[in-house]
Design a protein with these regions (language model features):
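Hydrophobic anchor at the beta1->P-loop junction of P-loop NTPases
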Residues: 6
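P-loop (Walker A) phosphate-binding loop of NTP-binding proteins
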Residues: 9
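Conserved glycine(s) of the Walker
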Residues: 13
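Post-Walker A helix-loop "phosphate-sensing" segment adjacent to the P-loop in P-loop NTPases
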Residues: 23-30
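Conserved nucleotide-sensing/catalytic segment adjacent to the nucleotide-binding pocket
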Residues: 30-31, 38-72
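Conserved phosphate-donor/acceptor-positioning beta-strand/loop module used by diverse small-molecule
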Residues: 79-97, 183-192
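Phosphate/Mg2+-binding loops and adjacent switch elements
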Residues: 85-177
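Conserved small/polar residues in nucleotide/adenosyl-binding loops
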Residues: 216-222
Length: 222
């Protein structure tokens, strides 16, 4: 089984990475408490899961040491374990939190100590907590990456082929309304209607004579 552990700084892009891994066929778990890593990985392997990814953040720092020690046990069982650590500059993290207007996860935890940390303090504290993880992880700085670029990078990281594009063509009548799930609608009422040709009326668009009637007209060529 292939197991990717996605971790890093809040605002670094973990959610984007997890969504891309899910699109690439991975069984994904977001915000997993670190102490559950070993039992869940063992359960997934037992159930025949071939590729899984879990996201763990700094809120599990109290159990980090035991959890990441368990990775050795997973490797000994033949599980291909890799850690992806996503980071960014302080300025970029501040910008991202400002855009989303979300609170830093360590800010809320700090309330139990009688004072809430500022965003700058929370980022600094998180860097301190997560520093040991970077020693064994593949570190990616996402400061200058667009979300689309990060998704492509993650796809290459796990060596998954690009998702296949699925096209569904559907004919419809305007009097019955547009198909609600359409992404693109083409008005082809300017083309000749084979229905009004007696020899073509019994046929469908899958028949070659109908296709020829439509494709080789001057309007279709334009």
């Amino acid at each position: 089984m292939q197991l990717i552990i996605v971790t890093g700084l809040s605002g670094g892009g973990k959610s984007i990475a997890i969504r891309q891994l899910e699109d690439s066929g991975f069984y994904c778990i977001d915000n997993l408490p670190a102490e559950f890593l070993l039992p869940i990985a063992e359960n997934l392997e037992k159930n025949g899961t071939r590729a899984a990814a879990v996201a763990i953040d700094a809120r599990s720092h109290a159990t980090f040491e035991n959890a990441f020690t368990a990775l050795e046990a997973l490797s000994q069982r033949g599980i291909d374990v890799r850690i992806l650590f996503l980071t960014a500059s302080n300025e970029e993290l501040l910008r991202r939190f400002s855009e989303t207007r979300r609170r830093h996860p360590l800010s809320t935890l700090a309330e139990h100590q009688g004072r809430e940390l500022t965003l700058n303090e929370a980022i600094a504290r998180e860097r301190e907590i997560m520093a040991p993880v970077t020693e064994t992880a593949h570190v990616l700085d996402t400061t200058r990456l667009l979300p689309s670029q990060l998704r492509r990078w993650v796809q290459q990281f796990v060596k998954q082929p690009a998702a296949k594009l699925t096209l569904t063509f559907e004919s419809f009548g305007y009097k019955r309304g547009l198909p609600y799930a359409s992404d693109l609608v083409f008005d082809v009422r300017c083309l000749p209607n084979p229905y009004y040709s007696p020899e073509l009326r019994p046929l469908t668009g899958l028949d070659a004579p109908v296709a020829s009637c439509l494709l080789y007209t001057s309007d279709a060529a334009d």
